[in-house]
């Protein structure tokens, strides 16, 4: 089929998944890890709309995310800060470009901002309807991309922190995290979802940027077949802590730098100037507003997303930074 929407390497996974869902066939491979996006496409097909209609859906979510970014920025530092946060979300070409792609990135970027805004509002006002809406948004965002699952422990800790007592941490946060760990270790669908991302294979091969071998790091050899199970990451990291941490730091560093050796120098210059300014403003914002609850929530979300990159790979096109760039903008 021909699509006005631009297609990426993974677009076929989502359209095929939507076709299978509408036909009441089980999802295959990595498709279950992107259930939320596949359901959006399946809904379009159910309504006899072409998959290209996902573009206006993504634009609507971007508009909602801009409003959420405005709300977060306003809560932290006033209306001007909110306006700038919303502006930097919608005018950033690195984010806007994904609105026209039949890929999960645009919807995840927008949903992440909306979800964090909803949770911040919910724990400030403590109204049942807001808490229910925040939980629903959390579940939605978790299903768009595999890295959305990091929001679950984040929100458990955020809720416990908001309650403001060690008793709350012990009664809410720790049991929640323990249950999550048990689920990851015991539930086959979650295990398969993690294994499908090949984190142990990426680690053993020293891959920094996906599909760019020039920057791969030489790593110590692994035992036979050890790369077939992601749970071997722990034992490998304990055996080679320096090499593992160096690789993780390289991945995180290249994600934050955003430039790439294969980009034109003019593009790298533009990116370098933009993100140098943004990181400088981020540092000032942390110094001035660290005590604000929303800032702590946003920083925690940024750190967790960087952690996911550290355990997997940096993207070839730099898109992983765009997933949480609006949080930096706020």
State the predicted function of each range.
Residues 74-79, 115-130:
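Membrane-interface transmembrane helices that cradle and orient dolichyl/undecaprenyl
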Residues 53, 69-91, 109-110, 293-300:
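Transmembrane-helix signature of polytopic, membrane-embedded enzymes
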Residues 53, 239-307:
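Membrane-interface anchor segments at the N-terminal boundary of transmembrane helices
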Residues 31, 35-39, 47-67, 98, ...:
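Loop-to-helix entry region of an early transmembrane alpha helix in multi-pass inner-membrane enzymes
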Residues 6, 32, 53-61, 84-114, ...:
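Multi-pass, polyprenyl lipid-linked donor-dependent membrane glycosyltransferases
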Residues 53-76, 114, 280-284:
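Transmembrane-helix motifs of polytopic, lipid-linked glycan transferases
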Residues 10-21, 27-49, 56-60, 248-252:
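Short hydrophobic/aromatic helix or loop-helix immediately within or flanking a transmembrane segment
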Residues 183-265:
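Membrane-proximal stem/loop segments at transmembrane-domain junctions that anchor or position
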